[in-house]
């Protein structure tokens, strides 16, 4: 066991700082690593050499500011990560490496009445297929990220009440999936994970406050305040789908009337077009028809956009992201 404050523990901490900096940035020159981590150029050079020798990073020549430099990035062989996303009617699994490359992915429909155990069994099967198809070394799997459409208690990992996945409330999906796969699993609300992705690699890079809006079977927001995901004590922060737009509006699945979700979610808006476009109309077809100029679909999509805009405006006035 390493003694805190010892040379070996300090060295490991410096290794982790360098790997984290490169992982978040995608690639950095050694000078940029030194500035980002606060380590000396000599320390960075030694660590990069060590990481290169064990196959964790790759070093390639580049040109920075007109001078020759070496760009450091994580090796595709450094480790494997898996993403699992559960929705109201779908399961999606992606397998990738630490170099930000997606190696394989698969989506399949999911019965809305399926229990958590049934859904996780399906996820285990899909993960096994992707591992077999890609031939990756299971020993290199670093972990799994699991997204679910409901509030997660951070302390216990328990999924709160959710009508999007009604058979999942009260379960601990990360613990259960970890037991099936034998690797660490991190679980969070899907909108929170979307916000984190934008913060680290997307439109939110370089900002400290943002709101990520997800519209699917429900409507939710992932909130980042001062660079950190804000969940609230019960993990329900960002449930903008239940902002009241019309007290006399349609009854929502939450029991209230006129929630934003009742004017935007597919289960509520598609029936508006059933008489003119058939009961088998899908969300994808409605959007396609709207793009092609169909008057009814254009009207419904326009109304959805206006209602979402009202909800987002309220959120922006409150938080100023």
Spans of features found by a protein language model:
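Short, intrinsically disordered, charge-biased short linear motifs at domain edges
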Residues: 236-245
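Short, acidic, Ser/Thr-enriched surface-loop or helix-capping motifs
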Residues: 97, 154, 224
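ATP-binding/phosphotransfer module of carbohydrate and carboxylate kinases, centering on a glycine-rich
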Residues: 1-140, 201, 247-251, 256-321
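Short, small/polar residue-rich loop motifs at catalytic or cofactor-binding pockets
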Residues: 89-90, 216-218, 238
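Glycine-rich phosphate-binding loop and adjoining helix at the ATP-binding site
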Residues: 102, 106-209
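Short glycine-aspartate micro-motif
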Residues: 81-85, 141-145, 210-214, 220-222, ...
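General beta-strand structural signal in soluble alpha/beta enzymes
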Residues: 59-60, 184-189, 223
